[in-house]
Amino acid sequence: MATSSHQGAAAGSQAEHRSCEASVGQGERPSASQGQEGNFKQNQGTSTLRLLLLGKQGAGKSATGNTILGKAVFESKFSDHMVTDRCQSESVSVRGKQVIVIDTPDLFSSLSCSEVRQQNLKQCLELLADDHCVLLLVTPIGHYTEEDRETIEGIWGKIGPKAYRHMIVVFTREDELDEDSLWNYIESKESLKELIKNIGSRRCCTFNNKADKKQRELQVFKLLDAIELLMMESPEPYFEPLKMESSGVQGCGNGVTYEGDTLCGSKKRQPQITGPDCDPDMPELRVLLMGKRGVGKSAAGNSILGKQVFKTQFSEKQRVTKAFASHSRVWQGKKVLIIDSPEISSWKLDESAVKNHTFPGPHAFLLVTPLGSSLKSDDDVFSIIKRIFGEKFTKFTIVLFTRKEDFEDQALDKVIKENDALYNLTQKFGERYAIFNYRASVEEEQSQVGKLLSQIEKMVQCHSNKPCVIREKELLNIILLGRSGAGKSATGNTILGRSAFFSQLRAQPVTSSSQSGKRTLDWQDVVVVDTPSFIQTPGTEKDPSRLKEEIHHCLSLCEEGMKIFVLVLQLGRFTQEDEVVVEQLEASFEENIMKYMIVLFTRKEDLGDGDLHDYTNNTKNKALKKILKKCNGRVCAFNNKETGEDQETQVKGLLKIANSLKKNYDEHSNSWVGQLKSTLGQITMAFK
């Protein structure tokens, strides 16, 4: 049979593809409904479906394409550089329909020059022809990185905000999931979770491209079922809206605007590209204006853009800017996107809006503040930004002082040096600051804007043109240990902020098996594991393996992330049983465990007006003193009857200690964490 293959047609030529008679889908497969089957075969009267493989370098696009085709057509090998350097296609007959698989290089990599990206995008459009198309976003399990984010943003920017309606996510390296589930993996990555939320949980599947033939065919069947479902849910033509959106590849023109839902959240931003000189591959600088109400953020944005686009007016009673908005201009061959924002104190009410409009993160923050204003509450402002972007945001920030006109001819450097608050503010941000005079002439205004943009560009270059990415939600596992009756379950309920564990004063142990609960606090997921008293685990006297099983069960309730141990003791009642518990923990987990443990005293209310540290420093109980010394003095106390803000204050105090301990883990003790996991996995029991 004569066949032909297209491997990156020259510009203007018609793309050709090779047709092969191999039919994926023969034999038994998971059944699809008659409606699905009919939709797949007869959709819009077309006989051809194109599957466009998209993803970063090394994601496994070519291998996935080969799995779908049932034969090795696309070159696929492990390499530290890009193997696929041009678009190529191959066809196969599937369920009575011709399916064309299009393999692509990394179309959106910032490491590729704009000419190469432009050429590849053009070839991609040629291969799409006028048929229906489904996008397959390929991403490897366990390796979701900045390049994946770059790909998602590129798809949204080049193909259009409706792209997710035509998309299925294919996770490669299924074998790396081990015993974990795909959904647990997705839940651990905030941006990935947001992507799947918008695409739909039924529009993702897993591939192991190294599996045997039967398993690979089963994977393809599941993918085809997902495609059928997509075609039922989105009956409109697939290619036409994509082609309209992607026409931006040929140039932006004047006043091109789009808004709406995007891949990683609704209304990430609404780019408004102005001017005939806009090139779709033009480097972009995303600049986020931030500050308190009335400081002049919108006015600063208008000044930078050179036009009145953001609403500005003086108002003492209400916010003028109530929602995020963005506009752009071209400056020295770059598209500068200015994102105006409401006052920062409102961000904590809807952090998702911040992430949506700045995704994957701004290249620069402009902290706008009038030169003579009070800065007393700015620390509260910074804490909100840190929660979303992490401590690193300070390295991406420039302070923009306004109202230079109020200081006449005074030198800015002198004003800053003579004002402690201003001096401390500029030191916090590496002495990066600028000033605007809103009464300046047109020439002066253009000059101050040019200087600011040059300063921004210089700062961005110091970060290799990478943005300040939105930080992934962190996770902390807290394992509560201690004797029966010490208050572990009540403490767990306090941390979770709800009654998740049964807690009652009884003579016999209430908790007979480990259990867990989860909450999110200050952009951190916290998993709390309540445990029985291991020395009183039922059946251990006759069968020591029961204890091993319980410890394994305890650890299985933890999620991927740092594990912090909290020894729960009752204030004023340190017993011999408490001492035995600690001895047995050390015997089982090695003495190292005490270096990574926090001591939490319950019944804080019994202290009255006393101080916890006075209590621990002055205790005459030698065994307790020894334990506190081994824990390096990490102690806190809970009144588990507290509610509301007082309860939250206690929890935040514990998490502060735990995160400090976590930081020590990260910086110094990664090897010990692995050793601990190994020790726990092999525990046989040395309890007395």
From Swiss-Prot:
GO molecular function terms attached to this record: GTP binding
Region G4, annotated ranges: 172-175
Tissue specificity as recorded in UniProt: Abundantly expressed in the thymus (in thymocytes), spleen (in splenocytes), lymph node, followed by bone marrow and lung.
Keyword 4Fe-4S listed: no
Binding site for GTP: G55, K56, Q57, G58, A59, G60, K61, S62, A63, S76, R173, E174, D175, N209
Biological processes, Gene Ontology terms: regulation of T cell apoptotic process
Domain AIG1-type G stretches: 46-247, 282-472, 473-677
Family matches, as Gene3D superfamilies: P-loop containing nucleotide triphosphate hydrolases
Compartments in which it is found: Endoplasmic reticulum; Golgi apparatus; Mitochondrion; Cytoplasm, Cytosol
Biased composition, class Polar residues, residue ranges: 31-42
GO cellular component, one term: Golgi apparatus
Chain segments carrying region Disordered: 1-42
Residue span of region G3: 103-106
Composition-biased stretches (Low complexity): 1-14
InterPro entries xrefs: G_AIG1, GIMA/IAN/Toc, P-loop_NTPase
G1, as annotated region: 55-62
Keywords, sorted A to Z: Cytoplasm, Endoplasmic reticulum, Golgi apparatus, GTP-binding, Mitochondrion, Nucleotide-binding, Repeat
Protein's job: Exerts an anti-apoptotic effect in the immune system and is involved in responses to infections.
Family stated for the protein in its record: Belongs to the TRAFAC class TrmE-Era-EngA-EngB-Septin-like GTPase superfamily. AIG1/Toc34/Toc159-like paraseptin GTPase family. IAN subfamily.
Protein name: GTPase IMAP family member 8
Gene: Gimap8
